[in-house]
């Protein structure tokens, strides 16, 4: 059998046409060294800052140092199987995490993988963990409240939707308790909560998750956990991952609340990574960009305008503004708020709630120092009734603290000073609150009203809290209509004031406390 040349060329042509050749062009390099989860790679010429790199064994890393002849990367996860000479490939992608309503009620790691044993997340969307914060034009001023359910915070340092309010204090003085109570109090308030646990013991994180489950708060909460046993890279990334999950709701005209517990541990993790990458250390051995580490994270919490939401959703959501409220936690050493990281975060946030160990040990819990705690923008968001009634409380407390210091040395006090000290003692007692028992607006209003109008002045200090509890029960049974009016209008009319005065007098006469 003989083939002529034209047949051969036709056969070759048909074979070539049927061939699907695809080239996967990817830059690759070689591992030079691996130490403490930090890898040096030679030969990766075309790599982005923050790009994901692919290592053998389905392991990924993050390119952080781009130098002339090598790349410094941090490995996400286990790195024991990576050795010198391994091939590393670029992916052309920035690190992304899953986002969307499917994440609500789940416990995830810093990369968005479920760690609660409830099966896969099945999120339909992913988003980059590093994003630029909304510009000035797209923002709205804070005007709606986030009720924490804590008397001392809602009355003296109110928080608004879209605000960044720092919770700062020494270890073991109730910072996490304030944050968890705030989450529990959001039941039925159409606010998605995200709790980011950074560098905490796994047992502590488990206790928080269990408490959220018991109170039914996990139904509207996402937990992102990077425990103390996880690598520094995971602890560094967890807040950004949580923030991206919160931004999904903010950008679609919903409200979200994110708690970073705590950012001191994130700064430590970032310092560790930076020193291992041989970046020059600065004050307290932190790298030069530790301020930017927190500012770029906290600036992403904002209240965005209706126009921003409409533009982002391509006109699907109209007339709704979204918000992401941040409650970062910072741990101080021996009450030193002038250290590097605390001063940085104080300057970035819109106010701080300062918790003191001395107050905590004295049984004043939540241990809030009213003199140093401020909310720079929350006043505009406070509910009318609380705003009306809380002005006197702050002044009473501030004057009491000042006078109490002098009263230790003075034996004979005039009547006015003595009265002020007595009032201050009762107000201090009134602001105490057990954990996991947040209050509704009407309960807070009634407590403040009774303090402002002198109904506590003739009580023993030890009777203040039983009186408050009894009063709430009495109003629930005998004055349900008054409660409903306060709760619906979030205000106290002249008629309601008279009704409340009458109810308080009746309750005091009954002595049922």
From Swiss-Prot:
Site note Required for activity, residues: 373
Keyword annotations: ATP synthesis, ATP-binding, Cell inner membrane, Cell membrane, CF(1), Hydrogen ion transport, Ion transport, Membrane, Nucleotide-binding, Translocase, Transport
Any GO MF annotation of the entry: proton-transporting ATP synthase activity, rotational mechanism
UniProt superkingdom: Bacteria
GO cellular component terms given for this protein: plasma membrane; proton-transporting ATP synthase complex
Bilayer topology term: Peripheral membrane protein
Catalytic EC class: translocase
Location within or outside the cell: Cell inner membrane
Catalytic activity: ATP + H2O + 4 H(+)(in) = ADP + phosphate + 5 H(+)(out)
The enzyme's E.C. designation: 7.1.2.2
Chain sites annotated for binding ATP: 169-176
Gene3D superfamilies: 2.40.30.20, ATP synthase alpha/beta chain, C-terminal domain (1.20.150.20), P-loop containing nucleotide triphosphate hydrolases (3.40.50.300)
A Pfam family it matches: ATP-synt_ab
Function of the protein: Produces ATP from ADP in the presence of a proton gradient across the membrane. The alpha chain is a regulatory subunit.
NCBIfam families named in the record: atpA, PRK13343.1
Family per record: Belongs to the ATPase alpha/beta chains family.
Subunit structure: F-type ATPases have 2 components, CF(1) - the catalytic core - and CF(0) - the membrane proton channel. CF(1) has five subunits: alpha(3), beta(3), gamma(1), delta(1), epsilon(1). CF(0) has three main subunits: a(1), b(2) and c(9-12). The alpha and beta chains form an alternating ring which encloses part of the gamma chain. CF(1) is attached to CF(0) by a central stalk formed by the gamma and epsilon chains, while a peripheral stalk is formed by the delta and b chains.
PANTHER family: ATP SYNTHASE SUBUNIT ALPHA, MITOCHONDRIAL
Name listed for the protein in its UniProt record: ATP synthase subunit alpha 1
Organism lineage string: Bacteria, Pseudomonadati, Pseudomonadota, Betaproteobacteria, Burkholderiales
Name of the gene this protein is made from: atpA1
């Amino acid at each position: 059998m003989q083939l002529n040349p034209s047949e051969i060329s036709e056969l070759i042509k048909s074979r070539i046409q049927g061939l699907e050749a695809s080239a996967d062009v990817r830059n690759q390099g070689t591992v030079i060294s691996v130490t403490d989860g930090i890898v040096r790679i030679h030969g990766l010429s075309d790599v982005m800052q923050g790009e994901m790199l692919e290592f053998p064994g389905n392991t990924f890393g993050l390119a952080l140092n781009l130098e002339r002849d090598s790349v410094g990367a941090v490995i996400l996860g286990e790195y024991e199987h990576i050795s010198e000479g391994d091939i590393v490939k670029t992916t052309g992608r920035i690190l992304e995490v899953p986002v969307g309503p499917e994440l609500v009620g789940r416990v995830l790691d810093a990369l968005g993988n479920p760690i609660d044993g409830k099966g896969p997340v099945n999120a339909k969307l992913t988003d980059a963990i590093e994003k630029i914060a909304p510009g000035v034009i797209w923002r709205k001023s804070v005007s709606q409240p986030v009720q924490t359910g804590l008397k001392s915070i809602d009355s003296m340092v109110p928080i608004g939707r879209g605000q960044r309010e720092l919770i700062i204090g020494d270890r073991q003085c109730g910072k996490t308790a304030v944050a968890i109570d705030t989450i529990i109090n959001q039941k039925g308030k159409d606010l998605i909560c995200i709790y980011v646990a950074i560098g905490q013991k796994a047992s502590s994180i488990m206790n928080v998750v269990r408490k959220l489950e018991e109170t039914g708060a996990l139904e509207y909460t996402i937990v992102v956990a990077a425990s103390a046993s996880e690598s520094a890279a995971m602890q560094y990334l967890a807040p950004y991952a949580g923030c991206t999950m919160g931004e999904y709701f903010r950008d679609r005209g919903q409200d979200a609340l994110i708690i970073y517990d705590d950012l001191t541990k994130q700064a430590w993790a970032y310092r560790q990574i930076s020193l291992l990458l041989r970046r020059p250390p600065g004050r307290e051995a932190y790298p030069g960009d530790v301020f930017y580490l927190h500012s770029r994270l906290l600036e992403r919490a904002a209240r965005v305008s209706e126009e921003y939401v409409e533009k982002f959703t391509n006109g699907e959501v109209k007339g709704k503004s979204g918000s992401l409220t941040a409650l970062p936690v910072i741990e101080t050493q021996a009450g030193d708020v002038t250290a590097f990281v605390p001063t940085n975060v104080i300057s970035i946030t819109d106010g701080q709630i300062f918790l003191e160990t001395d107050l905590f040990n004295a049984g004043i819990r939540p241990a809030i120092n009213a003199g140093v705690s401020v909310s720079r923008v929350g006043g505009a968001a406070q509910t009318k009734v609380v705003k009306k009634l809380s002005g006197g409380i702050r002044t009473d407390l501030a004057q009491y603290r000042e006078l109490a210091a002098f009263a230790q040395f003075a034996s004979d006090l005039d009547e006015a000073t003595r009265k002020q000290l007595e009032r201050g003692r009762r107000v201090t007692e009134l602001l105490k609150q057990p954990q996991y028992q947040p209050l509704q607006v009407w309960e807070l209003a009634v407590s403040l009203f009774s303090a402002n109008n002198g109904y506590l002045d003739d009580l023993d200090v030890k009777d203040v809290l039983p009186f408050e509890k009894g009063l709430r029960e009495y109003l629930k049974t005998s004055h349900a209509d008054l409660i409903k009016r306060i709760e619906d209008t979030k205000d106290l009319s002249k008629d309601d004031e008279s009704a409340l005065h009458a109810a308080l007098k009746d309750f005091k006469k009954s002595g049922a406390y």
